[in-house]
């Protein structure tokens, strides 16, 4: 037995190598690995089907076609193992060697490898400093290259055309050597001395005068250094012999009818061999040079096609006009080797079927059709049948199963017990798309799915299909049960809130049973206990929704029972609650939000098991009561508000009024459009509000005959209010008015649809609607693809972010505060710090007590402490500041959101982050707003009202008081706060330039009082002092045009771009003496006007401080105000520069304007100390700062969006991270999607991994080199230890695609995009892939280094501990004995 065991080769253990290296093969290497030369283009003999000798399928080279049998049949069977047959030369071994043995072709002339030639930048060209064009001319025999100038003083590797060559030959009497084709290039490469060249290039780089020259030299130096360090020789880029792929990897398959299907590679190899043999013959015959040249060129082309068909010239096509698939195409793209076979494989032991709902299942179960189970569990059944003695052989077991005998079903029941299966629904967008269940055998052919897990799978029962997978090994079963069981995945990894929450019918049922009905049967009764309520309900003495009082015990604490106002329905619901959950959690109308909260509270207080039981009970009770409620809708439930016609008529009047203003020339066309749209948006809102108020209120008669308004039981209202189905938006279209629609381009059509679906639309209105609706469908299709691509890029960039250590010991962190927008707190500080780890001790601002110790996780109770202490800023540890070399430390990451405790070692947090951001991507729109095409544009905000009462405080506001006594704001970054008695800021608003403030400092105001107002459609330019208006450089026809409106016939003065660059249109304010008025010591009353400004004053008019002298109209509002939705998220993660980005100042200082240069405006920022900085701003862009303003570093000097690279350069990494996190969150928040900040931070961390070298110091680094931060730090440490000068680098922000391609692992990068380019570069550098990320390991077929695949779990041994028996136990045993 032992002998047999050792006789066969062992499969190689996947752990026997720890890294993989790629480099360029030398001709010796190729020959050494080869098992023989392929000399003939023949494949197999068409009569005998045996491989031809020396051909592409030769058995002598590649091994026998049948196991242990030589070609001629002299030696057969195992006993001759290892003998080489003397007749046919074939070794007697298993035929599988035909998958691994390489051959080779010796070429008659060297040939350039197309990857090193054409993959940009061309490596051969770079090394020799020849342009690609010239290089191609030489290689394809159209030009000569100097291989040895001898003493003619010619430059090395100079390229000559035919004529120039002949001339030079005459001139120097053939004193130099030149040649053409790959052989000449090879000679050049061989004669290069890389060490000398590297020195030379370093010197050149230091002496380089222009930036371009330096960059070019740096590029060459990089290639030279790569060759030096890797030990590859440059001449290996030119091939002397070509390896031939093992034949089984390019098979020839006989089809019926005597034809063959073959791999394209065989055709390509055949071409190479044919041309090579012809060339050899021509050379033997000493044919004319022209013919040989032509043949050499054809050989070069054939080899090019074999390696990368279509890279140069036209792709070689097969007989069916389809381009042949070359070796490169085998690797590239979605159907290439990497993505098709290595990263995604098809799996055995799996099946798929349609899903149906299984409402009677428990949460951990799924219904598996018997037919499927029988097929999936076959080997287990055979084993069990044999064990039980029903059968003796596998064959008879097979027969038994095929006959489906009754014993088989009993055995199946047994086998299935405790054996979880995995269910998966495509597309698997996040890890909850695959979950494990215990199978329950069912009749029929459809899989039954538990209704509560539908949200996670995003499944519905309109014909969706799901796949079943069976974990086979014990280890995989354990992992499946512990990690993937649906009962262990109650919380969502994206935001840590429950994802197993009742939906639809269940919500409606629970909502119905917890509603209150006024004056129902049994109203006002008092019950002594929970049971008494039950009895009364069953006896029909009290209505489910009556308002009653019940005496209830608090089960969590032993307090006295108390009388509680509640309803019988809520008491029934209480019966299923765990004791730990207080009754107050459900003593209210339970909407979907409240139910989610209930599951969350239950999970925190009662633990996982109780939550699962509660979820199942909620499901049953929900379905039960939604059946009892029997809610249905009819057309009469859509109540159209009475005031609708009045509102619409009023709006039409207003629109007419606006039209008149336009005709009279008071407003521009853009303003008219904006105002019209605003009027309709407001009216739609108004009608919707009235309609929703109508729906939600009923009028009933009380027992004493009075009319009382009570919450309504209108079915449509109940559905929307409970969150079961439908939204206010949809109801508004049913019973209000459809409102404004958008064109596909995103503009809003200014005639709204005044009808609703109940009244029905007119033909025109229907036509306008179809526009938006169809766009919605087209968008959805595009969106899915785009969202999937975004997820793929995110996963790729973040796949190696793994929790690698418990604590990195950093002293750095982020300061987090509440998120406010327009004075409103949109996200409280508590939500942002929950589950994070505190960096320093967090102290109570009043008492100074330690609320949270440093390095302590902030959980729910601590969050409450922090919020009640009123802290506004908290310092936390963050992924962004984590100092771990590889991966991230647990303390910086904080809580694992899906489990509710500190994250475990080995958790693949990068992939989770990518999934959490990508999965809701399909919910984001391609453009910002659309609901069935209706444009939902909020009416522009024009004023501010106080939300709370308190006293007013101005922060950094400069203002002048105008003649009405209002304060007019004169600067941009002012803020106004409302402070309560204790001095805490309750709300804070940014105040726009030109706004009217209607309150004074310290004034006490009430809630709802107006604070400020402004015009949202124009940007005013105001005067700060009183005086007389004078125009400067405002010349009609040059820098200003009187634009006459065709409709109104009225004219406006508009500043236009003048051809004369020196003209700077401005308005000056003169004092009584006729001099330019001074505002203060340094600033004059001079206002420069940007292009497009409308001048609103006449020359010589008298103005007061705070008056508007010109207006800049804002753009017409489109629906896609900003790049919304998905494209915006992609834009942020790709770190693209926005189209019109704002110039920002790099220093703090005072603004002054310099003279215009090259048609650009010059803004000078002068700091208190140091040199002033100048910024050029294109003419016609509006400069948002004024002379004399104080600006801070990072502030924009003009209108436009921020450029993330600028933020990084000026304000640093933390500010950039904050900007990216906030911007991404804003897009998701608009769609109502919750994502935890730490996921976005994880991705941003991966984008900031690299630095760019600015100054090399004494290091071996190259200038402008981009490398991982830790490599740079290591190199600097090494130099500092020797007392050298360290290098200086700046942080680099890479987009996610760029970052994925520049990872350390070439396998991961190659499988992502630009496969050939990545592999070319890696092979030249002789890169070593340490297999540290997930992707590389999946591709190499190893366990991934995350979770249970971590190295530290690999070689564990389990040792059973001896139980220690205490003396008392021994005594008991004696007594019992």
Swiss-Prot record:
Pfam families for this protein: RNA_pol_Rpb1_1, RNA_pol_Rpb1_2, RNA_pol_Rpb1_3, RNA_pol_Rpb1_4, RNA_pol_Rpb1_5
Taxonomic superkingdom: Bacteria
GO cellular component: DNA-directed RNA polymerase complex
Enzyme class, spelled out: transferase
Annotated binding of Zn(2+) 2, by residue: 808, 882, 889, 892
Homology family: Belongs to the RNA polymerase beta' chain family.
Name assigned to this protein: DNA-directed RNA polymerase subunit beta'
Record gene name: rpoC
């Amino acid at each position: 037995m032992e002998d047999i065991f050792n006789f066969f080769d062992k499969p190689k253990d996947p752990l026997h190598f720890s890294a993989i290296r790629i480099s360029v093969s030398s001709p010796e290497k190729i020959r050494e690995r080869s098992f023989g030369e392929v000399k003939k283009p023949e494949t197999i003999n068409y009569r005998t089907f045996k491989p031809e000798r020396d051909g592409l399928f030769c058995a002598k080279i590649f091994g026998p076609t049948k196991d242990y049998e030589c070609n001629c049949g002299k030696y057969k069977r195992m006993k001759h193992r290892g003998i080489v047959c003397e007749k046919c030369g074939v070794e007697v071994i298993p035929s599988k060697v035909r998958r691994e043995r390489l051959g080779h072709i010796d070429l008659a002339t060297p040939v350039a490898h197309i990857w090193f030639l054409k993959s940009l930048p061309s490596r051969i060209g770079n090394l020799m400093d020849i342009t690609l064009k010239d290089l191609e001319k030489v290689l394809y025999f159209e030009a000569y290259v100097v291989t040895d100038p001898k003493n003619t003083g010619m430059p090395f590797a100079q390229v000559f055309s035919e004529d120039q060559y002949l001339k030079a030959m005459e001139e120097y009497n053939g004193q130099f050597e030149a040649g053409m084709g790959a052989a000449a290039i090879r000679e050049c490469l061989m004669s290069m001395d890389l060490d000398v060249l590297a020195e030379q290039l370093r010197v050149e780089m230091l002496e380089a005068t222009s930036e371009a020259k330096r960059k070019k030299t740096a590029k060459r130096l990089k290639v030279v250094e790569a060759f030096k360090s890797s030990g590859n020789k440059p001449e290996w880029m030119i091939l002397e012999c070509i390896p031939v792929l093992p034949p089984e990897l390019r098979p020839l398959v006989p089809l019926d009818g005597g034809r063959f299907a073959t791999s394209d590679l065989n055709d390509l190899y055949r071409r190479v061999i044919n041309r090579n043999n012809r060339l050899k013959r021509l050379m033997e015959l000493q044919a004319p040079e022209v013919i040989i040249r032509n043949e050499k060129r054809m050989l070069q082309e054939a080899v090019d096609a074999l390696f990368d068909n279509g890279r140069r010239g036209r792709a070689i096509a097969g007989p069916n006009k389809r381009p042949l698939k070359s070796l490169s195409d085998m690797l590239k793209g979605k159907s290439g080797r990497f993505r098709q076979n290595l990263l995604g494989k098809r799996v055995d032991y799996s099946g798929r079927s349609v899903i149906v709902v299984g409402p009677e299942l428990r949460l951990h179960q799924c219904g598996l059709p018997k037919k499927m189970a029988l097929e999936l569990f076959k080997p287990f059944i055979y084993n069990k049948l044999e064990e039980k003695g029903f059968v003796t052989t596998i064959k008879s077991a097979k027969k038994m199963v095929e006959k489906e005998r009754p014993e088989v079903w009993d055995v199946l029941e047994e086998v299935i017990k405790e054996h979880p299966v995995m269910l998966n629904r495509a597309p698997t967008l996040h890890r909850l798309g695959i979950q494990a269940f215990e199978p329950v055998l069912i009749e029929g052919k459809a899989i039954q799915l538990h209704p509560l897990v539908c949200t996670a799978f995003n499944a519905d029962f309109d014909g969706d299909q799901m796949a079943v997978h069976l974990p086979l090994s014990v280890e995989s079963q354990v992992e499946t049960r512990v990690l993937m069981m649906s009962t262990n995945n109650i919380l969502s990894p994206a935001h840590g809130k429950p994802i197993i929450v009742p939906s639809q019918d269940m919500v409606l049922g629970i909502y119905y049973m917890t509603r209150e009905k006024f004056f129902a049967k049994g109203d006002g009764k008092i019950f002594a206990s929970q049971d008494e309520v039950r009895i009364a309900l069953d006896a029909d003495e009290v209505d489910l929704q009556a308002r009653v009082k019940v005496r209830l015990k608090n089960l969590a604490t032993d307090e006295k029972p108390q009388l509680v106002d509640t309803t019988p329905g809520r008491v029934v619901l209480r019966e299923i609650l765990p004791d730990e959950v207080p009754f107050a959690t459900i003593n209210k109308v339970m909407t979907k939000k409240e139910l989610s909260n209930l599951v969350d509270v239950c999970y925190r207080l009662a633990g996982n098991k109780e939550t699962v039981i509660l979820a199942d009970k909620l499901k049953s009770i929900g379905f039960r009561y939604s059946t009892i409620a029997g809610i249905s809708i009819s057309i009469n439930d859509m109540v159209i508000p009475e005031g609708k016609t009045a509102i619409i008529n009023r709006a039409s009047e207003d629109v007419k009024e606006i039209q008149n203003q336009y005709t009279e020339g008071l407003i521009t066309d853009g303003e008219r459009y904006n105002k019209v749209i605003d009027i309709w948006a407001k009216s739609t809102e108004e009608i919707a509000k009235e309609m929703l108020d109508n729906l939600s209120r009923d009028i009933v008669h009380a027992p004493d005959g009075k009319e009382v308004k009570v919450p309504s039981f209108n079915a449509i209202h109940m559905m929307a209010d409970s969150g079961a189905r439908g939204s206010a938006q949809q109801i508004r279209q049913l019973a209000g008015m459809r409102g404004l629609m958008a064109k596909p381009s995103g503009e809003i059509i200014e005639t709204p649809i005044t009808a609703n679906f109940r009244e029905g639309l007119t033909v025109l209105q229907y036509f306008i609607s179809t526009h938006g609706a169809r766009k919605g469908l087209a968008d959805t299709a595009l969106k899915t693809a785009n969202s999937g691509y975004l997820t793929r890029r995110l996963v790729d960039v973040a796949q190696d972010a793994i929790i690698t250590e418990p604590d990195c010991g950093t002293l750095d962190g982020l300061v987090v505060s509440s998120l406010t927008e327009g004075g409103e707190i949109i996200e409280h500080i508590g939500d942002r710090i929950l589950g994070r780890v505190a960096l320093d001790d967090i102290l109570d601002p009043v008492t100074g007590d330690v609320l949270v110790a440093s390095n302590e996780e902030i959980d729910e109770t601590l969050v409450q402490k922090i919020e009640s202490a009123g802290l506004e800023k908290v310092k936390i540890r963050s992924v962004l500041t984590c100092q771990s070399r590889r991966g991230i430390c647990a303390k910086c990451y904080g809580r694992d959101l899906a489990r509710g405790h500190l994250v475990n070692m080995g958790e693949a947090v990068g992939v989770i982050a990518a999934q959490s951001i990508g999965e809701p991507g399909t919910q984001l729109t391609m453009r910002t707003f659309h609901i069935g095409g209706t444009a939902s544009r909020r009416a522009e905000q024009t004023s501010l009202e106080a939300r709370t009462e308190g006293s007013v405080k101005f922060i950094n506001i400069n203002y002048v008081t105008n003649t009405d006594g209002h304060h007019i704001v004169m600067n941009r970054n002012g803020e106004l706060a409302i402070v309560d008695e204790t001095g805490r800021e309750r709300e804070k608003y940014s105040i726009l330039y030109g706004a009217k403030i209607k309150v004074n400092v310290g004034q006490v105001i009430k809630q709802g009082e107006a604070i400020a107002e402004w015009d949202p459609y124009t940007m005013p330019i105001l005067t700060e002092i009183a005086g007389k208006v004078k125009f400067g450089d405002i010349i009609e026809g040059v820098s200003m045009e009187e634009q006459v409106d065709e409709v109104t016939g009225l004219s406006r003065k508009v500043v236009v771009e003048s051809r004369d660059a020196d003209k700077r249109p401005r308005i000056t304010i003169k004092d009584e003496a006729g001099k330019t008025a001074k505002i203060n010591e340094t600033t004059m009353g001079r206002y420069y006007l940007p292009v497009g400004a409308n001048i609103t004053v006449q020359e010589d008019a008298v103005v007061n401080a705070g008056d508007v002298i010109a207006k800049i109209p804002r753009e017409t509002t489109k629906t896609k105000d900003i790049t919304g939705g998905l494209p915006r998220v992609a834009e942020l993660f790709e770190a693209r520069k926005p189209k019109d980005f704002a110039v920002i100042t790099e220093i703090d200082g005072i603004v002054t304007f310099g003279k215009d240069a090259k048609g650009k405006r010059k803004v000078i920022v002068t700091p208190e100390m140091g040199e002033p900085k100048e910024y050029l701003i294109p003419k016609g862009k509006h400069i948002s700062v004024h002379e004399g303003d104080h600006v801070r570093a990072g502030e924009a000097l003009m209108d436009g969006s921020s450029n993330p690279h600028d933020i990084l350069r000026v304000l640093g990494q933390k500010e950039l991270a904050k900007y990216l996190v906030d911007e991404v969150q804003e897009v998701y928040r608009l769609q109502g999607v919750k994502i935890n900040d730490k996921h976005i931070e994880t991705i941003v961390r991966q984008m900031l991994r690299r630095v760019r070298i600015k100054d090399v110091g004494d290091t071996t680094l190259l200038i402008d080199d981009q490398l991982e931060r830790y490599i740079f730090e290591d190199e600097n440490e090494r130099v500092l230890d020797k007392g050298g000068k360290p290098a200086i680098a700046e942080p680099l922000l890479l987009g996610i695609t760029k970052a994925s391609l520049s990872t350390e692992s070439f396998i991961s990068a190659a499988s992502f995009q630009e496969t050939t380019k990545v592999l070319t570069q890696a092979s030249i550098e002789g890169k070593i892939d340490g297999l540290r990320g997930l992707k590389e390991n999946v591709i190499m077929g190893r366990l991934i280094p995350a979770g249970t695949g971590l190295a530290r779990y690999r070689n564990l041994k389990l040792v059973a501990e001896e139980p220690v028996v205490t003396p008392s136990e021994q005594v008991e045993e004696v007594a019992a004995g």
